[in-house]
Amino acid sequence: MKFFAVFALCVASVSAANLDAIAKPGFPAGRIINGHEAEKGEAPFIVSLKAGKGHFCGGSIIAENWVLTAGHCLIFDEFEIVAGLHSRNDESDVQIRKVTGKHQQIVHEKYGGGVGPNDIGLIYVDKPFNLNALTRDGTAAVAKVNLPTGKYESTGEGKLYGWGLDNSGFSPNILNTLDVNIIGYEECKNALNSDAPLDPVNICSYTAGAIDGACNGDSGGPMVRITPDGTELVGIVSWGYQPCASTTMPSVYTWTSAFDKWIEDSIENYAQLL
């Protein structure tokens, strides 16, 4: 399922140079523009959220019982979490966990819905993920990603992952990735329209003049940085300007470090209910 805010109405005569002027904030259409296939086992922490037979959002395993995603993704009472997925056509190494109700979902209490700040959510799974399982070729099938510790910067070179539509508009069978340049709130604010619903709890990916904005990944999916201590989840895909395949504006993410206390407290409070 795809999520959209109110998009700009574009006619065929509008030139690419004018698209940024009419672009509107919206949720990503789940696209990896100018990306390439990820290596198997490169991102064992990413999960696919599926309702019925359809992928609707991404997420990241942060503990054996917990997945971190965008708040706007948690709209269904029941859905499946598919971990260990690399190729859509091969589910031989996947682990599937069922979410049976809202009692397994936590959306940030200050998230107001739609495009805006505090777009973050947690999912609890009753059956823990097996984080020690290996695929048939010996790669890690499922693993958790590190949350930022503050030791390393959240900005700089990063990577984005997702199964979204590619340049041609087709959904790839293989997990895709894209190298991105991560910028902080102030720099992102200067690159966006003055009325953009940006908040200090956001970070962005941006390459000036490049058309690789909000299409770059599934809502709720991970933006990571590779550090000497492992892969850190620095951002969660939140929103970007639409039409995403044409705008040169930044993509906007929930900045994970801004919610480290909320994540910790939410998990601890939930544990007391079990």
Swiss-Prot record:
Keywords: Disulfide bond, Hydrolase, Protease, Secreted, Serine protease, Signal. GO terms for biological process: proteolysis. Disulfide bonds join C57-C73, C188-C204, C215-C244. Its EC number is 3.4.21.-. Residues 1-16 form the signal peptide. SMART domains: Tryp_SPc. GO terms for cellular component: extracellular region. It is an enzyme of class 3 (hydrolase). InterPro entries: Peptidase_S1, Peptidase_S1_PA, Peptidase_S1_PA_chymotrypsin, Peptidase_S1A, Trypsin_dom, TRYPSIN_HIS, TRYPSIN_SER. Belongs to the peptidase S1 family. It is found in: Secreted. Gene3D superfamilies: Trypsin-like serine proteases (2.40.10.10). The keyword Acetylation does not apply. It holds the Pfam family Trypsin. One of its GO terms (molecular function) is serine-type endopeptidase activity. Residues 32-268 form the Peptidase S1 domain. This is Lectizyme. CDD domains: Tryp_SPc. Expressed in the midgut. It comes from Glossina austeni (Savannah tsetse fly). The active site is at H72, D119, S219. Protein with lectin and protease activity involved in the establishment of trypanosome infections in tsetse flies. Binds D-glucosamine and agglutinates bloodstream-form trypanosomes and rabbit red blood cells. Capable of inducing transformation of bloodstream-form trypanosomes into procyclic (midgut) forms in vitro. The keyword Hydrolase applies. Induction: By blood meal.
